[in-house]
Amino acid sequence: MEKKKRYKSYLAIAGFFIGSGFGLLFAFSWNELVIVLNLVDGAWLAVISGIIRIIILVIMSSILFAKWFKQETIYTSDAYFLFALFFSILIVGKIYDIYNNLIVVSENATAEFVLFITKIRYLIVTMNIMPVLYIGLETTLALISAYIKNVNKSQFNKIRLGIVGIYLAIMLLIIIIAPTLSALIFALPYFTIGIYLLLAIMFFFMYKNKRLSQANALLIGIAFLCLIASSIIRSIITSIALENPSMIVVAEVITIIVNFVIFLGFITKPKYAKM
C-alpha cells in the first residue's frame, strides 16, 4: 500500500511539472497563438480535434493506471504500467502538437524556429515508443532464452539495452542532423516504420507462443501495422497542414482510431489467458 501511495505521488508530481511547463510555454506565445486562431482558417477546428484526442487519451491512460494499481504487487516493469506510460507520453505529445501546429503558421515563425520545435516533437515520439519496445523485447528475449541455453538473463538484459541504445542513437542522429523541416518530416518516418514493423512482429510472435497474458498481443500487432499506414498518411498530411491547419483534423481522426485499437489490445486478454 505504501508503495502504491509513493507511485501515485510520483505521477502527481510529474503531472504538475509537465502541466506547469506547458502553461509557461502557451503563456509565453499566447499573443501569437491567438492571432493564428483568429486569422487562419481551420485553426480552431484543429485545436478542438486535438483537445478531443487528449481527453480520449487521458481516459485510456487512467483506465490502464487503475488496472495497474489494482494489482496486489506493482512494478514499473508491469505491462499495465508501461501501456499507461505509452498513452501518457502520447498525451504530452498531443498537447505539444496543439502548440506546434499553431506556432508554425504564425507570422514570426522562422524556418529555423519551426525546425527546432518540430525536432522536439520527434524527440517525444522517440520516447513514446520506448515503453512498448521494452515490453516487446523483454517478452521476446525471455522466450528466446528458453531455446538458447548458453545465454543467461544478464546477457539478455545487455542485448535488450543494446537494442534500445541503438534505437535511441539512430533516432537522435536523424533528429539532430536533419537540415530542413521537409527532410525531418520525410526521413524520420522511414525509421519509425521499421520500429513499428519490428514491434508488430514481436507481438505476433508473443501471441503465437502465448507469452503475454495481460493483453491481446495479436490485436496490438495488427494495431502497429495500422500505425505504419497512419504514419505515412500523417507525414503527407503534416506537410499539407503547414498551409492548411484544418487538414490536421483528418490526421487526428485516423490516429484516434489506431490508438483505440491499440488500447483495446492493451485491455483485452487473449483467448489462451481465459482458458
Predicted stretch roles:
Residues 43-60, 76-141, 245-260:
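Individual alpha-helical transmembrane segments in multi-pass integral membrane proteins
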Residues 176-186, 240-242:
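Membrane-interface helix caps and helix-loop-helix hairpins in membrane proteins
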Residues 18-32, 52-67, 78-104, 166-170, ...:
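Hydrophobic alpha-helical transmembrane segments of multi-pass membrane proteins
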Residues 2-20, 135-175:
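The cytoplasmic-loop to transmembrane-helix boundary for the fourth helix
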Residues 2-71, 186-208, 265:
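First transmembrane helix
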Residues 8-15, 71-86, 151-163, 211-223, ...:
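Membrane-interfacial loop-to-transmembrane alpha-helix junctions, especially the N-terminal start
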Residues 1-4, 62-75, 137-152, 204-214, ...:
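Cytoplasmic membrane-interface regions of multi-pass membrane proteins
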Residues 8-14, 20-30, 195-275:
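C-terminal transmembrane-bundle signature of multipass membrane proteins
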